[in-house]
């Protein structure tokens, strides 16, 4: 069990009524809480959401606070400070004065910094500190009026092959405020991608998806991501750039196995972070299984850190892998099914 969940179980006497667990790990915590606790989970991680559903838990997959009332909330500290600001805002705009909010996190995950953010809403008390985790309690003294989701957007422009795109990114989304180096290295090659039905695996704020849709109005883009905030950001990016929703298919996925089949191309700057931890499962799975989702002669385009062994993995499953460029620590890899 996650050590943060163990802290919650140790201090379960503080819990009562309808309790919302926000960003909780997908372990056995919910099933081990006392039966008198009416626990629900709010997550934006689609893989976690599936685990909660399969375990019979009441779970919500969304960027927005669930549409019901709660007596308490437990926030598992996210990696992003901006995302925590958003979560605190929506919690304080749904809960009432004198209700309880708990904050739990790992020291290396920034729980002490997060506790300072919590102080804006009342006096806080540290309830537990063990196994490199801390649990803080707040009795709400100040609530907030909900702001529209759009007010949390960060926008920036990107120039790609004579096209200027406006990128919209919500809190917690990869490269929320600027173009990342890996995607920048890949972008000049996107005009070579085969047209048709194209999947953007790990779409993030929708930079790749948006360019491919604008480059050819007959392209259908399947924007795939595990994160609800990424999918929402991609939808907002399309809207901001005047691209019709008929070109966009948004799909939450747990990995490449959930992707559509018979695709003309898969393009990806694959994700490798899960919370504060590095995880290459999704990107390695992409290299190994992408071919199953492509038509004959369909294309795989990936940008990845040069130290990763993706060319070998791709060659093993496609029979070949071409390195299009090796620049600023990143390689653009190409394979044809």
Swiss-Prot record:
Annotated Gene Ontology cellular component terms: cytoplasm
Top-rank EC class of the record's enzyme: transferase
Primary localization class, coarse: cytoplasm
Cellular localization per UniProt: Cytoplasm
Gene3D superfamilies for the chain: Vaccinia Virus protein VP39
Keywords: Cytoplasm, Methyltransferase, rRNA processing, S-adenosyl-L-methionine, Transferase
Pfam families for the chain: MTS, MTS_N
Protein EC: 2.1.1.172
GO MF annotation list: 16S rRNA (guanine(1207)-N(2))-methyltransferase activity; nucleic acid binding
Catalytic activity reported: guanosine(1207) in 16S rRNA + S-adenosyl-L-methionine = N(2)-methylguanosine(1207) in 16S rRNA + S-adenosyl-L-homocysteine + H(+)
Family from the record: Belongs to the methyltransferase superfamily. RsmC family.
Subunit note: Monomer.
Function: Specifically methylates the guanine in position 1207 of 16S rRNA in the 30S particle.
Name of the protein this chain belongs to: Ribosomal RNA small subunit methyltransferase C
Annotated organism of origin: Acinetobacter baumannii (strain SDF)
């Amino acid at each position: 069990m996650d050590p943060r969940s163990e802290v919650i179980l140790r201090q379960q006497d503080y819990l009562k009524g309808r309790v919302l667990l926000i960003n909780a790990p997908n372990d056995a915590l919910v099933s081990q809480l006392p039966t008198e606790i009416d626990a629900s989970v709010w997550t934006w991680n689609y893989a976690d959401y599936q685990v909660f559903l399969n375990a019979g838990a009441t779970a919500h997959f969304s960027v927005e606070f669930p549409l019901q009332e709660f007596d308490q909330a437990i926030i598992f500290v996210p990696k992003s400070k901006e995302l925590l600001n958003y979560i605190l805002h929506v919690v304080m705009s749904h809960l009432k004065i004198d209700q309880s909010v708990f904050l739990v996190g790992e020291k290396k995950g920034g729980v002490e910094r997060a506790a300072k953010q919590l102080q804006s809403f009342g006096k806080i008390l540290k309830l537990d500190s063990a196994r490199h985790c801390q649990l803080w309690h707040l009795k709400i003294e100040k609530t907030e009026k909900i702001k529209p989701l759009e007010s949390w957007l960060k926008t920036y422009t990107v120039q790609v092959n004579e096209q200027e795109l406006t990128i919209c990114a919500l809190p917690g989304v990869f490269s929320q405020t600027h173009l990342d180096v890996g995607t920048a290295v890949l972008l000049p090659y996107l005009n070579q991608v085969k047209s048709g039905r194209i999947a953007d695996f790990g779409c993030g704020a929708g930079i790749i998806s948006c360019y491919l849709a604008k480059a050819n109005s007959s392209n259908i883009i399947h924007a795939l991501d595990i994160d609800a905030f990424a999918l929402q950001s991609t939808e907002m990016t399309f809207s901001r750039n005047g691209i019709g929703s008929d070109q966009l298919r948004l799909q939450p996925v747990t990995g490449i196995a959930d992707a559509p089949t018979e695709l003309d191309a898969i393009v990806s700057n694959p994700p490798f972070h899960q919370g504060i931890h590095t995880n290459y499962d999704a990107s390695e799975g992409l290299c190994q299984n992408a071919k199953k989702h492509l038509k004959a002669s369909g294309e795989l385009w990936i940008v990845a850190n040069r130290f990763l062994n993706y060319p070998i993995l791709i060659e093993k499953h496609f029979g070949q892998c071409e390195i299009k460029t090796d620049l600023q620590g990143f390689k653009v890899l190409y394979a044809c099914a």
